[in-house]
Amino acid sequence: MVVVLDTVSANPVRPRHPEKVNRPDALSPPKPDWIRVRAPNSRGYADTRRIVKENGLVTVCEEAGCPNIGECWDKKHATFMIMGDTCTRACAFCNVRTGMPAALEASEPEYVAEATHKLGLAHVVVTSVDRDDLDDGGAEHFAQTIRAIRERCPATTIEILTPDFLRKDGALEKVVAAKPDVFNHNLETVPSRYLTVRPGARYFHSIRLLQRVKEIDPTIFTKSGIMVGLGEERHEVLQVMDDLRSADVDFLTIGQYLQPTRKHHAVMRYVTPDEFQGYETVGYTKGFLMVSASPLTRSSHHAGEDFAKLQTARAKLLR
């Protein structure tokens, strides 16, 4: 865990990533043509941004610099990020602000539910920063948000993307008891890259977290994702697939890592669209109900459409 607090300046202006300020620049190769996206400028994008701001909400779409924000917000699809905009971890790949977070906003679950209603979402995705500073890692806040959405928008299906609740006994059980439709927790990368990419996390703890969800409530769909282009080998990606299937995970996403700033981990290489297609094919042969693998695949991209496909795939399996 990395927690940074400025106790010197009267009115401190903190850098977004203070722990990275003194690092040397990490240079990445130029982006290939298949990575480029259009700048967001549509009416739907503007409407979504207005609703998000009016409700005082944070989205991972903005905070993480997602390349799909224009496409998703044009369709009024947004991923709400609860518990503030500041994370207690300092992962080498992530653009979310790091440091000591503010206290939880007690009304936030209702604000998220109201924004879900205003956007007319049939499927909503809720994620969060890591909150190692809280006794339960924010689990009760997650559960309250799920319950608030259920009350305000009973027909809306709910997908959550959670932190790992490392060393937070009982936290996972609180979240699962609120019965989200999809429980997503991303592994982010292969085990050999954890010390440099995701040093505050533990690979097999994350695998066990996903496995426990299914043990507690087998009806909940489970989902996980990784980025490629961080120096991993193909055989390591295939091993991650096997580990996830051993935990009975239903849905795998694989996308290209893109460097947020030069202070973040460099892109080691750009994986080709054909390689992504190969990963998707192999993933299906290993038994996943859904696999989404492409350069611009992200955890919440097309989440609503993918949830419908998950339901169909499970129904076919149970016939």
UniProtKB/Swiss-Prot annotation:
InterPro entries given in the database record: Aldolase_TIM, Elp3/MiaA/NifB-like_rSAM, Lipoyl_synth, rSAM
Region (Disordered): 8-29
Annotated metabolic or biological route of this protein: Protein modification; protein lipoylation via endogenous pathway; protein N(6)-(lipoyl)lysine from octanoyl-[acyl-carrier-protein]: step 2/2
SUPFAM superfamilies referenced in this protein's UniProt entry, alphabetically: Radical SAM enzymes (SSF102114)
Catalytic class of the enzyme: transferase
Catalytic activity: [[Fe-S] cluster scaffold protein carrying a second [4Fe-4S](2+) cluster] + N(6)-octanoyl-L-lysyl-[protein] + 2 oxidized [2Fe-2S]-[ferredoxin] + 2 S-adenosyl-L-methionine + 4 H(+) = [[Fe-S] cluster scaffold protein] + N(6)-[(R)-dihydrolipoyl]-L-lysyl-[protein] + 4 Fe(3+) + 2 hydrogen sulfide + 2 5'-deoxyadenosine + 2 L-methionine + 2 reduced [2Fe-2S]-[ferredoxin]
Positions of [4Fe-4S] cluster 2 binding: 87, 91, 94
Subcellular location: Cytoplasm
Family: Belongs to the radical SAM superfamily. Lipoyl synthase family.
Cofactor, how bound (note): Binds 2 [4Fe-4S] clusters per subunit. One cluster is coordinated with 3 cysteines and an exchangeable S-adenosyl-L-methionine.
Record keywords: 4Fe-4S, Cytoplasm, Iron, Iron-sulfur, Metal-binding, S-adenosyl-L-methionine, Transferase
Keyword Iron applies: yes
One Pfam family here: Radical_SAM
Protein name: Lipoyl synthase
Domain of life: Bacteria
Positions with a binding annotation for [4Fe-4S] cluster 1: 61, 66, 72, 300
Positions of the Radical SAM core domain: 73-289
Cofactor entry: [4Fe-4S] cluster
NCBIfam families cross-referenced by the UniProt entry: lipA, PRK05481.1, PRK12928.1
GO MF entry, a single one: 4 iron, 4 sulfur cluster binding
EC number: 2.8.1.8
Organism the protein comes from: Nitrobacter hamburgensis (strain DSM 10229 / NCIMB 13809 / X14)
GO cellular component: cytoplasm
